[in-house]
Amino acid sequence: MTMQTITAVSGNDDAATHGAAAPPGGALLSLDGITVTFPGVRALDAVSLSVRAGEVHGLMGENGAGKSTLLKVLSGVNQPQAGTLTLNGTVQRFASTRAALEAGIAIIYQELHLVPELTVAENLMLGQLPSRLGVVDERALAVRALDALERLGEHIDPDIPVKYLSIGQRQMIEIGKALMRDARVIAFDEPTSSLSARETTQLFRIIRSLRAEGRAIIYVTHRMEEVDALCDRVTVFRDGRRIETFESVAELDRDQLIGCMVGRSIEDVYGYRPRAAGDVMIEAKGLTGPGLSEPVSFAARRGEIVGFFGLVGAGRSELMKLLYGATRPSGGHVELGGKRVAFSSPRHAVRAGIALCPEDRKQEGIVAIASVADNLNISARRHFSPARVLLDARRERDLAQRYIERLAIKTPDGDTPIGALSGGNQQKVVLARWLAERIDVFLMDEPTRGIDVGARAEIYNLFYELAEAGRTVILVSSDLAEVIGVSDRIIVMKEGRIAGEVAKAQATPDALIKLALPR
């Protein structure tokens, strides 16, 4: 089966706007009354949905809303107990992923389904390798692979193993696989979660090209800005049901969208709770180091949530690492509770009462293959086993269970690998780890990135509880609504220095952006 041509889209092309999209055609894919049940759970409850040819249809909802189950129905992984799936006018029922692919439906999952040891060309043609007399036709394979890569706009050697490619390049190979099978419906599951800004731009160009060809695109995301940039319509799921389909993204009311997702208003999501601040808990005096262009000075009090806002490269994450002892300052110092401190490592910072929830949660915050209990106990373990020879399994199990219940961490049990949890529940485990350490200062670097709205509300409530208990929370966030909605005051950084501070009452998007923009 040959791959159809993908129309090239330049960075300045008008197709980047909604108005330039190809007019949507009739429904290419229709779901009517789809119901999927598991023991004790109704994952999809009589869901009806249509996706048109030539549109990008966004799917939004909290984790557990039913989006992933819907994709599994489309791909043949799950078979519904009721309802019908109609593709291009024909009722279909897929008994396997192969059947769905052959019918023309492809899913691009977050966890890419490539074989790392095989070459780019072999992955592109997986399951349909060209052969002659029972032997792979290497020449035909190379020609088809080069053709596919050229049409995707990717300059990749087709003979190198996929394991050497970036995440963005691997994702392009997945898209190429779908097009090699001439998929007319392509679903993307949180595709930008691990991509750089450049890779995201390239992905959007490809998706717009696919839309212009008349393919039906399903786009699952938590990110409002991606819906604005890419989608024609958006459907919201909650608790296994389709709540509403918004017919025009250009006229979308964000507050209404969030309300549909979580079942409450946007004010309830942030739920700001004012409180009195106490004495200064942490203070930086003339701090300099990697990522800072000028000496940085600021103070944060007990019971206070201090927001740090800035654009990419402003120096916020670098400042947090200096406070945490992950990097060494070249000048200035830090005071904790009025006493001068100097940390040679994060371990020393933790023992003094400072903890960091890092920006890259998956790489720096958790051990993905370890259990929830092991991740939670990583730091507290030294209290249970001073000699560091024998582990106290019972105490560790009890501690894990206590915090699983206290923070309402959604996991079957403490032995579940943390990598199997949603982003919001992974972040709760990281927070629980530090709660078990009696931390005074919580450095939260982009704590809700990639987390759905409902889980965000739960994490914000944890911040308020910490502040009400006299702890200090420093919130680094690129989300304007979040940093304004949660913080007591906001410090804005720009080009490695503090550009200004904004009080709660004066905090508006315009005020923060004006301070954050480069000269």
Curated annotation (Swiss-Prot):
GO cellular component, one term: plasma membrane
Topology in the lipid bilayer: Peripheral membrane protein
Sorted UniProt keywords: ATP-binding, Cell inner membrane, Cell membrane, Membrane, Nucleotide-binding, Repeat, Sugar transport, Translocase, Transport
Enzyme class: translocase
Substrates-to-products reaction catalysed: L-arabinose(out) + ATP + H2O = L-arabinose(in) + ADP + phosphate + H(+)
Residues that coordinate or bind ATP: 61-68
Entries under InterPro entries matching the protein: AAA+_ATPase, ABC_carbohydrate_import_ATPase, ABC_transporter-like_ATP-bd, ABC_transporter-like_CS, P-loop_NTPase
GO MF term list: ABC-type L-arabinose transporter activity; ATP binding; ATP hydrolysis activity
First-listed, main subcellular location of the protein, grouped into a coarse class: membrane
Domain of life: Bacteria
Function of the protein: Part of the ABC transporter complex AraFGH involved in arabinose import. Responsible for energy coupling to the transport system.
Name of the featured protein: Arabinose import ATP-binding protein AraG 2
Species for this entry: Burkholderia ambifaria (strain ATCC BAA-244 / DSM 16087 / CCUG 44356 / LMG 19182 / AMMD) (Burkholderia cepacia (strain AMMD))
Gene: araG2
